[in-house]
Amino acid sequence: MHAISSAAPAPSVRLPFYRQLYFQVVFAIIIGVLLGHFQPEYGAAMKPFGDAFIKLIKMIIAPVIFLTIVTGIASMSHLSAVGRVFGKAMAYFLTFSTLALVVGLVVANVMQPGTGMHINVAELDQTAVKGYVSKSHEMTLTGFALDIIPKTLISPFVGDNILQVLLVAVLFGVSLAMVGDAGKPILDFLDGLTKPVFKLVNIVMKAAPIGAFGAMAFTIGKFGLGSLVNLAELVLTFYITSAVFVLVVLGAVARACGFSVLKLIRYLKAELLLVLGTSSSESALPSLMEKMEKAGCAKSVVGLVVPTGYSFNLDGTNIYMTLAALFIAQATDTHLTLGHQIALLLVAMLSSKGAAGVTGAGFITLAATLAVVPEVPVAGMALILGVDRFMSECRSLTNFIGNAVATVVVSRWENALDADRLHRVLDGEAEFLPEPERAVEPVVLARHRA
């Protein structure tokens, strides 16, 4: 086992509230909203701060994923565990992604948020959505599969394709495990490199309030507070549906696995506020991986489930896609039969797998879905373009919580979860616990040989 052992540190003193990240992010968001509302020109000019923070996060995502996966897989006693963890994760993703699509479809049929608008498609300004539609044409299933394979071993680290990094990391980790003792020096080096990389994550996260401020000031300055209430019924329906999905559906699976989804949300409050401020679940990916390990999830499970979930487990995006598609159909008086809705569901199941956890990806994925389902006019997307930016925040929050729950659940299924540590961390004792060993527990994972 390649772990960094250390004595348990003395109990630390709880930081004052104003030094805690979640308070700083909340304060920054409020200041951003006020600046964007009262000085919209200055607010819109704050966009570079948000963009800069997102770039900083993207800078560290690739090394965090690579090191976590490689050291986790290479430390496993049996490589069959890799395939087993991946298989269980994909089974979870498929089940709950489909359930999220169905929930959005059912809610849209029951609430009918677009009924009564009687929009004439010919009168809509289609130029605003042309860019999204053109991008959606590139999102074919074959193109998505081929895009996972990088041109070189180095190219994933200079791009922003998480799945390419994941593929290279898995292959390298498996190769390192197969060479046995000959690969031990490399594994020791990568193990040692993990600690400063996660320290770098902590340093970058200190800039989170600045990034949240810039992103929120730009949003309000650009679109105005009035856009928050525009098409209020659709937005409200989406927010309520997502909240019910998290509390009821994810809450039920969490209870079945012995933990509380509300306590998990409280534990991740700083990351959730960051996601809220930036409208990108990707902005908190490195921090999520670190916190899931601290909560008792095995390193190998975290390394496989979290990055994969960012493309295959997007509950919020799935709810949004079917809900928004039916809203457009209702608003344009387009009648969809049960067969049409089932076809929409099947297409969305495929197209949603290519959505990344970045701002605007959900809208592009919706365009890709509607392009394949001719019954719903793609031009109708102009109806929701104005409020999509604010729905993006809810999508990202739901996606983020869904991946956090998935990580704990798959760890539990693998018997690779320190349940006692999880409960203590979720009860607020995280800062009084020693750091978990950075390496995966290969003995625990090996209990379930295929």
UniProtKB/Swiss-Prot annotation:
Per the UniProt entry, what is one GO biological process? Answer: L-aspartate transmembrane transport
The way it spans or sits in the membrane comes to: Multi-pass membrane protein
Record's keyword annotation contains Iron-sulfur: no
What Gene3D superfamilies would the database entry show?
A: Sodium:dicarboxylate symporter
Q: What is its main location?
A: membrane
**GO MF annotation, one:** succinate transmembrane transporter activity
The entry's cellular-component GO terms read: plasma membrane
Q: Does the keyword Transport apply?
A: yes
* Family matches, as InterPro entries: C4_dicarb_transport, Na-dicarboxylate_symporter, Na-dicarboxylate_symporter_CS, Na:dicarbo_symporter_sf
The subcellular location is: Cell inner membrane
Q: What does this protein do?
A: Responsible for the transport of dicarboxylates such as succinate, fumarate, and malate from the periplasm across the membrane.
Record-given protein name: C4-dicarboxylate transport protein
Give the species: Acidovorax sp. (strain JS42)
